[in-house]
Amino acid sequence: MKLPNKLGPIHFIGIGGIGMSGIAEVMHNLGYTVQGSDAADNYNVKRLAEKGIRTFVGHRAENLAEAELVVVSTAIRRDNPELAMARERRLPVVRRAEMLAELMRFKSCVAVAGTHGKTTTTSLVATLLDAGGLDPTVINGGIINAYGTNARMGEGEWMVVEADESDGTFLKLPADIAIVTNIDPEHLDHFGSFDAIKDAFRAFIDNIPFYGFAVMCIDHPTVQDLVGRIEDRRIITYGENPQADVRLIDVDLRGGQSRFRVMIRDRRPGFRLEMEDLVLPMPGKHNALNATAALAVAHELGVAPEAIRRALAGFGGVKRRFTRTGEWNGAQIFDDYGHHPVEIKAVLKAARASTEGNVVAVVQPHRYTRLASLFDDFCTCFNDADTVIVAPVYAAGEAPIEGFDRDTLVAGLKSRGHRNAVALERSEDLAGLVNGLVGPGDYVVCLGAGNITQWAYALPGELSALGEKAA
């Protein structure tokens, strides 16, 4: 039995969240009556309202109105007034991942998992399948610039979704094809241990049907170890590793883009295909690897090499993934969602390869628990930045943890040899700090999952205003 075509109004609590908004948009496009509320009138709420979806700012019991089904994210507390009213009325309440799983049953599905790179890889898979005429439905964890949204309703057989492992609910997703980009210690507040995270990813792969397959990056040692423990499922490996089935070769990261070639070797004796002169207009080896994963899926689904080449070259990127927000005095300012040490290191490495100038990193640590559990990694992931400006921790509702804050991170960076790490007292002081640091050819990279994105977009104008005052 699949999701009925006729359901009463479906109410999303937290509809402005990136995952919730995508599901709501697709369900609206399928003809369901959708409504929802969020604490803030953010970009996603406004976008959904423009599409004709009824939205409410603030959570109140009366918002449910005639709703017959309620969808909630894991961020919603049990004492939320709308959730309490739904339970008082004995309405069905489903988690975000459960509703996504129901939507996936309408299509054949590619699910993209991994600690890092999910959103970009999901976008790349969607772009390549679209270029191959497969017209996929897409539900992503970030805004795909070419679509202006994180969700797209296609007419084709395939759906491409980002599989969020943060609360373990990605195990509910019925994928035919799975991608695993990497596996690192993250979301330990939910899983409790790294071993539990690895077990969850193994279960994710084991859930694939016998006629499906998994695409896994064996450049990452934990993923390579997992490949060795998977039985009875078809695995396609990718990476720079010489043993990879789909091998990334000759990566050139100069000029703010990635040039590379890919060699595909099937387990069939003698089968070999080389794709040369591939260009992705995004910097960083991590993005070249993401593109290689997407290429592996597209090739398996019959997308022609020339269509893959054109689609990669025209890829418009994803919002908050090395997104250029402006320029001042010849220096480029970027916004990036990177908030885990592995992500920060990859982004700064990409920035370093893309410019001959200086790289200034502005970081807003996200959550005290993350800073505490990965503190040593945070202290050593900024080596490619000439200067690190550290803002106060974005708490995301957490209580402070003694010994893990902005100042201890600055001290930790310095004690491990970084030559220029400074504390930012207030966001209003950022332009003044940056003003004395950058010139033509330099990069300023704003990093974090909090509200630092607003600073990144405001910074070019604030720097210009400072310059006008000085004149």
Swiss-Prot record:
| Sequence positions that bind ATP | 114-120
Asked whether the keyword Coiled coil is assigned, the reply is no
Q: Which GO terms describe its biological process?
A: cell division; cell wall organization; peptidoglycan biosynthetic process; regulation of cell shape
Keywords (A to Z) from UniProt: ATP-binding, Cell cycle, Cell division, Cell shape, Cell wall biogenesis/degradation, Cytoplasm, Ligase, Nucleotide-binding, Peptidoglycan synthesis
> What is its subcellular localisation?
Cytoplasm
GO MF terms on file? ATP binding; UDP-N-acetylmuramate-L-alanine ligase activity
Q: In which pathway is this protein known to take part?
A: Cell wall biogenesis; peptidoglycan biosynthesis
Q: Specify where it is mainly localized.
A: cytoplasm
Give the GO cellular component terms, alphabetically: cytoplasm
- Catalysis performed (reactions): UDP-N-acetyl-alpha-D-muramate + L-alanine + ATP = UDP-N-acetyl-alpha-D-muramoyl-L-alanine + ADP + phosphate + H(+)
Enzyme Commission designation: 6.3.2.8
The UniProt entry, under InterPro entries, shows: Mur-like_cat_sf, Mur_ligase_C, Mur_ligase_C_dom_sf, Mur_ligase_cen, Mur_ligase_N, MurCDEF_pg_biosynth, UDP-N-AcMur_Ala_ligase_MurC
Gene3D superfamilies for the chain? Mur ligase, C-terminal domain (3.90.190.20), Mur-like, catalytic domain (3.40.1190.10), NAD(P)-binding Rossmann-like Domain (3.40.50.720)
Which NCBIfam families does UniProt cross-reference here? murC (TIGR01082)
Q: What does this protein do?
A: Cell wall formation.
Family under the similarity heading: Belongs to the MurCDEF family.
- UniProt-recorded name of the protein: UDP-N-acetylmuramate--L-alanine ligase
